[in-house]
Amino acid sequence: VVSGIRVDAERLIDLADFSDASPRAIAGEVARLVNGGDLGAGDRLPTVRELAAAIGVSPATISQAWQALARAGLIESRGRAGSFVRGAASARLAPRMRGMAAPDDPVRLDLSRGTPDPLLLPALGPALSRVSAKAETGSYQAEPVIPQLARVLRDSWPSDAEAIMVVDGALDAISRTLEQVVRFGDRVVVESPGFPPFLDLLEVLGTVPVPVRLDEHGMRPESLAAALRKRPVAVLLQPRAQNPTGASMTPARAEALARTIEAAERVDDLVVIEDDHSGLISIEGDVTLGTWLPDRVVHVRSFSKSHGPDLRIAALGGPRDLIEHIAGRRMLGPGWTSRMLQTILLDLLVDGTAINTVTEARRQYYTRQRTLGDALRSRGVAAVPADGINLWMPVLGERSALVQLAAAGIRVAAGTPFLAASDATDAANGMRQRAGGDFVRVTVGAVRAAADEVADDLASAATHLVAGGY
């Protein structure tokens, strides 16, 4: 297909099946052509009036279809110049993050981003007014972690970590730990589905991901045991509110995974890296394999979802030697996380009003999860009960669901970027049973009201295919 050509209405009708002339079906047919390569990036689509006349529908019908495609990120409007098939996402984003990047087009309800509800975050104003007299900004020699924050972190840590440091967010912690643990060509056990930036990071580091399947309690011990036979150097997992499934480990599951690692052969140097990204908004208790494997576990606690993504702050705890290696390497870069930010976080962690705000946020997210999840299940969608702000929703067809929801003014995240290599390949090749079927991620934490109406749209998209299977 030659990109950048003008596709007239006659050509589009030859390529597509517009026997169902509803906005949703028309959008689905054009989506199929884009994803199949029949329409290329930069191709100019027929005008609304031209295609409406050719098909025999009203211009409003085509306009609604075009709007749905734009919301799904497949086409873009350039004003009087017309509507065009979108090009590739910016190269500044890694491959799977490009797959998750949402277009800038406004939608009625954006459930794609996996971010906390801003209205549930503690106010920073009072903390800022209090810390101005306490924060230290004039020293290169002070301790990298302010002592008061170190004590608060240690008192609440889920295991007896030998050392704890503060870094610039959970992904910074994961990246710095992996850089100390893995070498090019090493194997790393990952969850599938899992967090797309982890998979991008492993690709950048030249490692080989070994996917492990999940259930409602996280990694399955028998699947982990099979993965360990490939002699990985690290296991990367999310103990609570797993992104995207919302699964949280029970203490029994954590112990079973730890015993599985203990029993495995030829993995004596294996390191477990835990990303507790939801932290204080998770309804489940803090849990770590470090309770049973203290010398082999690095535990990360993020404060982004509980206290604000722009604070860019997380804590990292584990064996002293490894933490000191990470801290030493960091001194050759940023050195430390701003002590001003650390002081703000400390204030938020001990202030009664901020504590109550986070407690209420945790309750609200639990209520939103339960309300929307129950509504979906009552409508025939087999959504597994989840923790945190995300829900992994099974659908008959990923692209079809995205287009249908876009037509309803709702944006969700496509499921494919969350799959590790072999599972993603299976999904792309249509081997849905082996890959576990099609899914989309829904940020239910953003559903403040009208859960039944949202559930109606989600369930319809999950249980129906538009024309052509898209």
Where are these regions (language model features)?
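Generic structural signal for small/hydrophobic residues in well-ordered secondary structure
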Residues: 62, 111, 153, 164, ...
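Conserved core segment of the aminotransferase class I/II
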Residues: 298-362, 466-467
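Short beta-strand "wing" residues that participate in macromolecule-binding interfaces
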Residues: 76-78, 383, 412
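Conserved core of the PLP fold type I
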Residues: 135-268, 280-296, 467-468
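Hydrophobic multi-pass inner-membrane translocation pores used for secretion
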Residues: 271, 277-283, 306, 322, ...
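N-terminal basic, amphipathic alpha-helical segments
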Residues: 1-130, 331-337, 349, 359-367, ...
